[in-house]
Amino acid sequence: MRPQELPRLAFPLLLLLLLPPPPCPAHSATRFDPTWESLDARQLPAWFDQAKFGIFIHWGVFSVPSFGSEWFWWYWQKEKIPKYVEFMKDNYPPSFKYEDFGPLFTAKFFNANQWADIFQASGAKYIVLTSKHHKGFTLWGSEYSWNWNAIDEGPKRDIVKELEVAIRNRTDLRFGLYYSLFEWFHPLFLEDESSSFHKRQFPVSKTLPELYELVNNYQPEVLWSDGDGGAPDQYWNSTGFLAWLYNESPVRETVVTNDRWGAGSIYKHGGFYTCSDRYNPGHLLPHKWENCMTIDKLSWGYRREAGISDYLTIEELVKQLVETVSCGGNLLMNIGPTLDGTISVVFEERLRQMGSWLKVNGEAIYETHTWQSQNDTVTPDVWYTSKPKEKLVYAIFLKWPTSGQLFLGQPKAILGATEVKLLGHGQPLNWISLERNGIMVELPQLTIHQMPCKWGWALALTNVI
């Protein structure tokens, strides 16, 4: 600064000194105590219910043997299930340990941008990656998992960071992480377990530091906890961590959590309820829930021995999505990449098929609410969603009637006001009221090539009761 400039700048500088300091980053007006009563009162961020559909990704060292299940280590070493024991005997030397799979987990062809593009094409609105499964191997360079993480072993890459950047730069999806609280064979956990969890060495030195590290470094907007190892939430200090997550963390305003925070917490505490794997009750629940399920009927991780009949068809997947959303849930659909980091053709096909279906019918899925009836009482495989502000009810039907007439027992038409359209077709359809309740809709006569989509269709009904 030159001396002659001082007089000219003195007044503005004085004003700056007199101005109040800039406000700190906004915190939620509500502060949460480290108690379930307080934490359970937190309102779930609206984006999660609006999203409806997410992708689960089970990937890790278990993708190297890629046999039987992602629980390979447990079934082989702990339960000693014969087919796993025989698999190891037939394919690896007697001295081979599970840890020896680590260097073989190369992720040689992993391309986060390609993954992100596939997920975007699927129509999903969020993803959840297994940052650490029950084996303890972390897909980031955890400071608390020395020599058993993706930086020190195998890929020599920060998988979590690469996917986080790709998702946030290339898509409109929310980024989420799965994290297993316990580890099957970690000596500190086993020692704590032997003390009936009176000792807390493992959560203090491993679990909690890693959770803070994950949230601060990668800012996941879904934190999907799992694997309590039979220990109560007090052992994990779950309420203390969640109070920090909701009050102080960089994702405090938008993060959603599930209900797996200690023995007895499932379907009782947390943000949204998962209840159990593949949970699909078929009826309305009083709390937001998620159906986490997997395309491979037998495993969450990739299996080399899987046959085509082991995978759910696109028709079955669309049905799961429709049933789940009609009953107020979200669908979290799982894939298992290969050890090389590729998404196999069958998984990619299912994802892209779901995306093409949602391009036509997403209006009946995203940002919808449950209706007074979840499914129809006259015609099977008809499920309802709604948008009350727009006075819209959607009837999603999974079988096209051969008669060309769709009978709906639940909606009551309003003469002169009700309008019915087929999504992807656009023209108003003819309908008549039935004698007691419901309506009969005349579907358009279309060839297979004129159909707006395959695997399920949606009617938009305006002004029905």
From Swiss-Prot:
It is found in: Secreted. Glycans are attached at residues 169, 237, 375. It catalyses: an alpha-L-fucoside + H2O = L-fucose + an alcohol. The modification Phosphoserine is found at residue 299. Pfam families: Alpha_L_fucos, Fucosidase_C. Gene3D superfamilies: Glycosidases (3.20.20.80), Golgi alpha-mannosidase II (2.60.40.1180). GO terms for cellular component: extracellular region; lysosome. GO terms for molecular function: alpha-L-fucosidase activity. The keyword Flavoprotein does not apply. It is an enzyme of class 3 (hydrolase). The record marks 292 as: May be important for catalysis. Residues 1-26 form the signal peptide. It comes from the Eukaryota. One of its GO terms (biological process) is fucose metabolic process. Its main location: secreted. Keywords: Glycoprotein, Glycosidase, Hydrolase, Phosphoprotein, Secreted, Signal. Its EC number is 3.2.1.51. Homotetramer. Belongs to the glycosyl hydrolase 29 family. Alpha-L-fucosidase is responsible for hydrolyzing the alpha-1,6-linked fucose joined to the reducing-end N-acetylglucosamine of the carbohydrate moieties of glycoproteins. This is Plasma alpha-L-fucosidase.
